[in-house]
């Protein structure tokens, strides 16, 4: 009996030790395959309310009709058998509301009205707006309300100040300042220090203005000189004035305008003999969209041959394009959805479409880490901090966000490599995270290895299509003008001399007559006064 009691006591002690050991190992972090799954299942299913603020007007490249298919594609991925099932608690669902932001205060009003209608209930995530003037007040309110805000817009330089009013903003598309960093690396590669900025500014969206503002600020910080010329391409374009400005400013010209306007400018400078290697022209293709000048010279008109020659001096800066099978599938689905909306165009997938898709993936990654750390979806500041300073796989390749919550920009430079056929290829790439620009070694440049090493201080003699003589002296018309001008000047001097002489004689005679008359009138007045006083 005593042995039975000892055996029972020993078994109890052994069982207690096993249980304690299990608890200790669990508290230290169980790394067995099923442990993470059980921890994730312990979290409650999440209902994520997303407010998308984008314009309904399809004239914008980031309209709801264009971007919504990309957002829904990403949501199907994270809610289905993709990223979301691995990262979020089972049963998590996204409830998305789409509101018209326009490009002004409507975005702010939509946010405030929605919160008021929900009796103070705020969304868990804001996607958009894109336009600077729409994004600014929404970003300030998001910071005040502790709401994470992810946008493929708000690209102007002012939004990089995240310490106060824009603290809850993450930009998932390269900001304009990133374009400036790319141009700076390009200039350092070619040993240039001066640039002329020529751009269209309609005073509304002002995309080109904000783009070259970013270039200007980066250049200014690094001691590079810039001068600027702006025009409104929606009105009559004074090409002669643009050419005169370029001739009187810098040798390296950075342009931003629509594709048709860039073509007109290049034709104009070509006709003035400015595409023979004395200038370097760069065109910025914004947003991976051909509407902002993709470097295409062909229009099927009578100017094609001339434009092909002109474009041999033009290089186009565009976002680096990567192709992977998933991106092709994504592009086809977006194209199908957009066409159902009645939109038929070439650029179904631009920078904004890609950016908002990747914004969903980035938010899910950040939310996963916040929930795992014991916080909730309402901890907007914690979530937004998890979106910064990280790299993840986007729909078109790797996406890297810097420590300030801004996406690094990877860019390519496209130029004409076959002047006979007019073929254009990528000749160089810039990798934003490394800050590195490199020319491609397998490309034949039509200008040779030293053509772009411009002498920025040398004065250029400009020619145009009209015949002219350059004999070193004055032309016949100039001499004739000088002689005629001298004769006219002499005639005017003689006429003035004789007029002045005649006028002086006339004045002297008139003065003599007036003095005689004044003497008579004085005597009469004095006699009248004396007679009056005598009578008095």
Swiss-Prot record:
One of its GO terms (molecular function) is chloride ion binding. It is found in: Cell membrane. Disulfide bonds join 103-131, 208-256. Residues 500-536 are cytoplasmic. Keywords: Cell membrane, Chloride, Disease variant, Disulfide bond, Glycoprotein, Membrane, Receptor, Signal, Transmembrane, Transmembrane helix. Residues 1-26 form the signal peptide. The chain crosses the membrane at residues 479-499. Chloride binds at residues 101, 130-131. InterPro entries: ANF_lig-bd_rcpt, ANP_Clearance_Receptor, ANPR/GUC, Peripla_BP_I. The keyword Lipoprotein does not apply. Disruption phenotype: Half of the mice dies before weaning. They display reduced ability to concentrate urine, a lower blood pressure, and skeletal abnormalities. Despite a reduced half-life of NPPA in the circulation, the plasma levels of NPPA and NPPB are not affected. One of its GO terms (cellular component) is plasma membrane. Glycans are attached at residues 81, 288, 389. Residues 27-40 form a propeptide. GO terms for biological process: angiogenesis; blood vessel remodeling; negative regulation of cold-induced thermogenesis; osteoclast proliferation; positive regulation of urine volume; regulation of blood pressure; regulation of osteoblast proliferation; response to ischemia. Has low affinity for peptide hormones in the absence of bound chloride. It is linked to Defects in Npr3 are the cause of a number of skeletal-overgrowth phenotypes, Longjohn (Lgj), Longjohn-2J (Lgj-2J) and Strigosus (Stri). These are all recessive conditions characterized by an elongated body, thoracic kyphosis, arachnodactyly, and sacral and/or tail kinks, but no significant changes in craniofacial structures. Belongs to the ANF receptor family. Homodimer; disulfide-linked. Interacts with OSTN. Receptor for the natriuretic peptide hormones, binding with similar affinities atrial natriuretic peptide NPPA/ANP, brain natriuretic peptide NPPB/BNP, and C-type natriuretic peptide NPPC/CNP. May function as a clearance receptor for NPPA, NPPB and NPPC, regulating their local concentrations and effects. Acts as a regulator of osteoblast differentiation and bone growth by binding to its ligand osteocrin, thereby preventing binding between NPR3/NPR-C and natriuretic peptides, leading to increase cGMP production. This is Atrial natriuretic peptide receptor 3. The lineage of its organism: Eukaryota, Metazoa, Chordata, Craniata, Vertebrata.
């Amino acid at each position: 009996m005593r042995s039975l009691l000892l055996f029972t006591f020993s078994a109890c002690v052994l069982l207690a030790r096993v249980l304690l050991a299990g608890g200790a190992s669990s508290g230290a972090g169980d790394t067995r395959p099923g442990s993470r799954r059980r921890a994730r299942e312990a979290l409650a299913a999440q209902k994520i309310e997303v407010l998308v603020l984008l314009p309904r007007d399809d004239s914008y490249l980031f309209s709801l009709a264009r971007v919504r298919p990309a957002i829904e594609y990403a949501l199907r991925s994270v809610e289905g058998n993709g990223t979301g099932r691995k990262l979020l608690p089972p049963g998590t669902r996204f409830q998305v509301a789409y509101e018209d932001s326009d490009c002004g205060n409507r975005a702010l009003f939509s946010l405030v009205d929605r919160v008021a209608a929900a009796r103070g209930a705020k969304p868990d995530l804001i996607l958009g707006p894109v336009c600077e003037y729409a994004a600014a007040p929404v970003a300030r309110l998001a910071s005040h309300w502790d709401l994470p805000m992810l946008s493929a817009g708000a690209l102007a330089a002012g939004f990089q100040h995240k310490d106060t009013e824009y603290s809850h903003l993450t930009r998932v598309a390269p900001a304009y300042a990133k374009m400036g960093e790319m141009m700076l690396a390009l200039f350092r590669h070619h040993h240039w220090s001066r640039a002329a900025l020529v751009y269209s500014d309609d005073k509304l969206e002002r995309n080109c203005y904000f783009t070259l503002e970013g270039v200007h600020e980066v250049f200014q910080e690094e001691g590079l000189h810039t001068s600027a010329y702006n025009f409104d391409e929606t009105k009559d374009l004074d090409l002669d004035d643009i050419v005169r400005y370029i001739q009187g400013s810098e040798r390296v010209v950075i342009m931003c305008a629509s594709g048709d306007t860039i073509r007109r400018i290049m034709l104009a400078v070509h006709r003035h003999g400015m595409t023979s290697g004395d200038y370097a022209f760069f065109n910025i293709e914004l947003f991976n969209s051909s509407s902002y000048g993709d470097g295409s010279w062909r229009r099927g008109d009578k100017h094609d041959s001339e434009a092909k020659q002109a474009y041999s001096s033009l290089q186009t800066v565009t976002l680096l394009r990567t192709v992977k099978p998933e991106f092709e599938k994504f592009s086809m689905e977006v194209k199908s959805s957009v066409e159902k909306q009645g939109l038929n165009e070439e650029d179904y997938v631009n920078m904004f479409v890609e950016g908002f898709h990747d914004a969903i993936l980035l938010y899910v990654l950040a939310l996963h880490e916040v929930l795992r750390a014991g916080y909730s979806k309402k901890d907007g500041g914690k979530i937004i901090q998890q979106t910064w300073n990280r790299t993840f796989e986007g729909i078109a390749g790797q996406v890297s966000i810097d420590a300030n919550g801004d996406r690094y920009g990877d860019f390519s430079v496209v130029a004409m490599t076959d002047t006979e056929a007019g073929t254009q290829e990528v000749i160089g790439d810039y990798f934003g995270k490394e800050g590195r620009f490199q020319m491609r070694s397998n490309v034949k440049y039509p200008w040779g290895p030293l053509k772009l090493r411009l002498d920025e201080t040398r004065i250029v003699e400009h020619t145009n299509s009209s015949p002219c003589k350059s004999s070193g002296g004055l032309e016949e018309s100039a001499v004739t003008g000088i002689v005629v001008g001298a004769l006219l000047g002499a005639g005017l001097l003689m006429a003035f001399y004789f007029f002045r002489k005649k006028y002086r004689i006339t004045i002297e005679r008139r003065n003599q007559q007036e003095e005689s008359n004044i003497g008579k009138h004085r005597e009469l007045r004095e006699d009248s006064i004396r007679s009056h006083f005598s009578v008095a």
